[in-house]
């Protein structure tokens, strides 16, 4: 009865033709339900032959109906047994049953006959199947519980909402009490089929109830529903989320009829939940007993109690399968490693996982050590079981590995066979020399604050210390993250430069004095008395360019080295910020020509004084225009403009020639237009 599908098309009654004396036969096609009869997957509409005595005075070829309005009269199945009262009219039927009930009841009678034939076939196949105990599968055992289990009722529900109620033929139970939903008790062994919508008002506790109230529910979960599909003789899609109720006898039949080809690797545990009332005074309380009847679970035993749609089904609360409880076995990820290598790796990880001893700091304390303690002799030679101090990484207190853990792992210099004794001795010497040089930070950074400009080239300085400093220490300093600079002082000597002549030394001293003076004064203003002025009466001082200082060449016959020019440029940059830039006064028109000549003409060389008090011939080379003719034209234009302005002023005294010039700027607008 699995995967049955009702259709909206029903067959109407057909005329009954009289074949012989006193009996008539009518063939009615049943299309209210499509059944897959067999394993070939074909949908068949099986006609049913009805036999009944013809109604008297019924003309031939006229449709025969009953007085109830279009319903067939009471008919009997020729090949099946109809329970008494099954065809009588009912007043409590639902709307779907009252509509065209004649054809529907006829189809239901035929389906009951098919069910009985299918279960008979199942009994024959169960006897032909091999014993499951030979395959290593446990047979379900029958559980006996206290109580008067004189009879039981089976309720089976498929995926489309069809419930099948049956009464075991071997149990002496009052079948009339269990068939109260139908008018008339069914015969023994006959299945009652009705849609579950008609029985929605019934409680869910009706499944497998004993007369004394004992309820036995067997839940088939997962792929075990395939057995029920095979039992009905039809192949349908798996619907493991449905509840199938069965008596204990049905469980025994399941054990007899189960086959490995239907169970396979998808077989799961079968559970039976039995709820029995207590025999004592506490009759209202119930105790649930759950016992695993069959252990046929395999690798998919963890999916017990879940259907394909994820609906939970009552079953055992925990998996008792030994396969599910076995521990996962670890596989070797690196097959190249031998057991000895793996043991070494385990030892190293175990040593690293151990923390420092209690009360001992995991991080080294650098506050109490000097700047040279990072490269002490102890880091290489004094500790036999340790590593050099500069190799140790400071670990935090939050769970890192301490240097003691590294020492406990057996790491030492003997683990590096590539180093020879001579190389180790060189390493010790380099570390010792570096530690001696790093005792004082003042030897690394020169103190420029207390050293004057005269101490730049003295005897104790860069060259002497550079000659004494070993080359290997520079590379060692780079490896330790420090700046590779030579430990030097702030003093040097001119004797270290034998190529310099007396003139070069004189130039150096002069440049040194100029630089020192410029640094001391900075950007202070110098008195304008030292500036050169043209004797042009009321004119302002000419503007002096910041870069108008001419290079000082003491002796043109002597060669000058390139570094002297660099010193001269530095001096010029320092001096150019000390000159005052006087502004040109252009308040009067008569000074325009003079100012223009001073800016654009060729001024004569003038004597001036620099910031050091020396007299020099200053020529502002940058202020001289490269086009003198254009400059003269501009100067003449300025003079002509001044003369024209004077003429206009004299003509406008009476305001007759140009009347608008006597007005203000606003009054001039519109005058003379």
Curated annotation (Swiss-Prot):
Region (Disordered): 36-73, 171-216, 229-409, 478-497, 520-552, 585-673
Biased composition range(s): Basic and acidic residues: 288-303, 520-534, 638-673
UniProt entry tagged with the keyword Calcium: no
Ranges annotated as biased composition (Polar residues): 171-183, 193-216, 234-246, 268-277
Coiled coil: none
Compositionally skewed regions (Low complexity) per UniProt: 278-287
Domain of life of the organism encoding this protein: Bacteria
Keywords: Crown gall tumor, Plasmid
Additional detail: The Ti plasmid contains at least six transcriptional units, designated vir loci, which are essential for efficient crown-gall tumorigenesis.
Protein known as: Protein VirD3
Gene: virD3
């Amino acid at each position: 009865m699995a995967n049955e599908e009702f259709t909206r098309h029903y067959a109407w009654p057909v005329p009954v033709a009289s074949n012989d004396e006193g009996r008539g036969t009518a063939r009615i096609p049943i299309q209210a339900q499509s059944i897959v009869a067999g394993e070939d997957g074909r949908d068949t509409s099986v006609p049913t032959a009805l036999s009944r005595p013809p109604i008297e005075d019924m003309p031939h070829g006229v449709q025969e109906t009953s007085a109830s309005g279009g319903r067939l009269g009471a008919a009997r199945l020729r090949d099946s047994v109809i329970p008494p009262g099954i065809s009588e009219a009912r007043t409590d039927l639902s709307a779907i049953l009252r509509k065209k009930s004649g054809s529907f009841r006829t189809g239901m009678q035929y389906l009951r006959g098919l069910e009985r034939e299918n279960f008979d076939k199942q009994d024959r196949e169960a006897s032909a199947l091999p014993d499951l105990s030979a395959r290593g599968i446990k047979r379900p055992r029958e559980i006996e519980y206290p109580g008067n289990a004189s009879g039981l009722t089976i309720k089976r529900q498929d995926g489309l909402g069809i419930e099948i109620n049956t009464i075991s033929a071997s149990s002496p139970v009052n079948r009339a009490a269990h068939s109260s939903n139908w008018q008339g008790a069914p015969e023994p062994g006959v299945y009652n089929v009705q849609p579950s919508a008609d029985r929605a008002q019934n409680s869910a506790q009706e499944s497998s109830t004993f007369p004394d109230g004992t309820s036995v529910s067997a839940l088939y979960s997962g792929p075990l529903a395939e057995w029920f599909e095979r039992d009905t003789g039809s192949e349908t899609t798996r619907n493991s989320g449905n509840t199938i109720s069965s008596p204990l006898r049905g469980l025994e039949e399941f054990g007899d009829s189960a086959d490995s080809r239907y169970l396979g690797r998808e077989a799961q545990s079968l559970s039976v939940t039995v709820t029995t009332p207590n025999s004592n005074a506490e009759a209202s309380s119930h105790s649930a007993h759950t016992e695993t009847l069959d252990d046929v679970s395999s690798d998919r035993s963890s999916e017990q109690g879940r259907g394909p749609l994820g609906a939970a089904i009552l079953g055992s609360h925990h998996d008792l399968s030994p396969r599910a409880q076995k521990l996962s076995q670890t596989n070797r990820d690196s097959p190249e490693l031998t057991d000895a290598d793996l043991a070494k790796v385990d030892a190293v990880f175990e040593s690293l996982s151990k923390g420092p001893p209690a009360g001992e700091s995991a991080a080294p304390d650098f506050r109490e050590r000097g700047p040279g303690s990072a490269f002490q002799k102890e880091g290489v030679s004094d500790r036999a079981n340790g590593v050099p101090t500069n190799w140790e990484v400071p670990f935090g207190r939050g769970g890192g590995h301490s240097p003691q853990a590294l020492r406990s792992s057996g790491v030492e210099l003997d683990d590096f066979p590539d180093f020879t004794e001579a190389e180790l001795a060189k390493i010790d010497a380099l570390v010792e020399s570096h530690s001696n040089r790093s005792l004082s930070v003042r030897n690394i950074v020169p103190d420029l604050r207390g050293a004057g400009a005269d101490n730049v080239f003295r005897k104790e300085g860069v060259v002497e210390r550079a000659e004494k400093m070993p080359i290997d220490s520079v590379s060692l300093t780079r490896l330790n993250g420090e700046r590779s600079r030579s430990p030097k002082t702030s003093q040097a000597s001119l004797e270290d430069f034998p190529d310099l002549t007396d003139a070069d030394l004189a130039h150096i001293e002069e440049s040194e004095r100029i630089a020192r003076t410029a640094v001391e004064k900075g950007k202070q203003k110098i008195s304008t008395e030292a500036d050169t002025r043209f004797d042009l009466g009321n004119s302002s001082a000419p503007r002096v360019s910041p870069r108008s200082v001419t290079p000082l060449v003491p002796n043109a016959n002597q060669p000058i080295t390139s570094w002297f020019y660099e010193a001269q440029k530095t001096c010029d940059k320092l001096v150019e910020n000390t000159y005052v830039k006087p502004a040109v006064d252009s308040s009067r028109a008569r000074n325009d020509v003079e100012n223009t000549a001073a800016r654009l003409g060729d001024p004569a060389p003038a004597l001036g004084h620099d910031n050091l008090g020396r007299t020099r011939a200053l020529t502002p080379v940058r202020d001289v225009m490269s086009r003198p003719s254009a400059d003269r034209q501009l100067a003449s234009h300025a003079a002509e403009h001044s003369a024209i302005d004077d003429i206009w002023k004299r003509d406008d005294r009476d305001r007759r020639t140009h009347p608008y010039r006597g007005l203000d700027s606003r009054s001039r607008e519109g005058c003379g237009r």
